[in-house]
Amino acid sequence: MVAKRLGFRRDEALTLGRAVASLNAYSKGVSLGLFRPSPKSLKERRKKLMRGRRLKVDVLRRAVPVTRTPDGLRALSGGRPISPASVQRYLQDKFGDCLAPARAAMRGLARSAPPKTLAASGYTLYVKFRPSVAAGVKGWGARGKLDLNLIRRLTKTSRSRNS
């Protein structure tokens, strides 16, 4: 929702959101000792192997690698464009019947602040409503409950601050 509010088309926003989620998950995995960052030389070799022009887009204070495709910008994962359809399937699988209400609540929150404010404070908002899971490795990959009423309350608070 943040990328859409910042002016990206729906398909572009889906891939950017997925990339941000993956980058955040990877960072948490590194902090828990589950992953080791790849050596700089390996990263440089990977960059040289990637075809097409790469750009970076700032979403929620994350530099997301993207490329232009005939269908618009696509965030990259493993050097390849993320498919918006695969993101949609993933969301449908994870949220099921709750996807539409969750999307509506998040859309309301995204619209409650001007784009510049949202770009600067979107991650802080997310931290306030993200589902809680067990701390440390126990919580890695665990499912939490998304509190839509909390998101709606944050929307009201944000609207009153930004009006």
Q: What residue ranges belong to the model's regions?
A:
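Solvent-exposed interaction surfaces and binding hotspots enriched for charged
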Residues: M1-S163
